[in-house]
Amino acid sequence: SKDEAKKDDSKGSVYYLNFKPEVDKQWQKIAKAYTEKTGVEVKVVTAASNQYETTLKSEIAGSNAPTLFQINGPVGYESWKDYCLDLTDTDLYKNLTDQSLAVKGEDGKAYGIPYTVETYGIIYNNAIMEKYFALDGAVVKSMDEINSYDKLKEVVEDMTAKKKDLGIDGVFASTSLKPGEDWRWQTHLANLPIYYEYKDNKVSNMDKIEFKYAENYKNILDLYMDNSVSEKGLLGSVDVATSMAEFALGQCAMVQNGNWAWSQISEVDGNTVKAEDIKFMPIYFGVDDENEGLCTGTENFWCINSQASKEDIQATKDFLTWLTTDSEGKAYMYKSTDDGGLGNAAPFTTFGEDERSSDPLAVEMYKWMESGKTSVSWNFTTFPSQTFKDDFGAALLEYANGNMSFDKVEKQVVDEWASEKG
């Protein structure tokens, strides 16, 4: 029977080193299904959380090295380029919705292909917003009118003044500044000033930055902290989970996070946010508000091991073609994790409207991607290091506690960037 499809060595085999422990079960199921269908062996090994680079280093040096692995972007490519196959002539690259998303070498060729895109912005609970619009004296009557930083600030401050009427403890969820829980500010929010500075200079990386848009960054961070569920002095003990629970329980109207957050929100005990009420708006930054979309990108790029055998390379290409063009393969890609799929928002033209995640924040992401607005690209993969980000986060906590001026925070960011990149 097809359940006993024999392994056929002449067909080559696939070995995928998977980055995401949360979808290991799904990948094992995919591997089995593909082997049963084709007779080609597919092995999936999942690295432990935060151990991917270490695992890849030891595995790639072994006699049975992964034929398929992942990198996080241009920085990861620099470390692994000796093992990245040129994918420019593959269906995988040709079928990308936006080829600028691929990781390219200095030769302009594609070496890393994004298999899912993600986005982040300001998530809001539309039910609370509608309640606000109906109040006497509300400064706007619909979300369409909130289209700039200035307008957002005006609305947020008015909502804070009316929070008793709205039944909320703050407009924004608490700004989690606990060490290790501060990535939304030292990475995601910090991406915006860097994105605009790179854009002004027409580059995708810089050895030294001016932190030209530090003031814009400070403004939005202050807006979050001054209109939040928690007092500034308490933010050092707040983690992301607490912040997301505040949103889920209806204690606030807005929270900065990404499309991956819906599962966190919906799984909170006592969640009050309905799927049809969870929406996205851009993190209006006061630079190019009329054109700014959500922050859309990925840290998930597939690479094929250029040092694998010719047969294994072909088998791996075929496996990826199946995942992105065959109806069965595509179903594994886009179906939600509850439904046995990977829940990927696959950026390929081969996926039809009905082959997209029905997750409400994924639906919002596609809506914004197709709105004609300019997506803010993910440039935080070019930040100097984890230490740089951790130090930035620690400085933000000192700033929140009133122990450090923002000028000092700004100086630290500029100095550490230069010394680490130099």
Question: Where is each model-derived feature located?
Answer:
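Short, solvent-exposed loop/beta-turn-alpha elements that line the ligand-binding surface or hinge
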Residues: 88-102, 141-145, 176-179, 194-219, ...
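Hinge/lid segment of periplasmic solute-binding proteins
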Residues: 72-130, 184, 188, 277-284, ...
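Glycine-centered hinge/linker elements that transmit conformational signals in sensory
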Residues: 154-157, 201-237
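Extracytoplasmic "Venus flytrap"/periplasmic binding protein-like
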Residues: 33-99, 109-112, 127-138, 246, ...
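C-terminal capping/gating helix-and-loop segments adjacent to ligand/active sites or protein-protein/ligand interfaces
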Residues: 296, 360-418
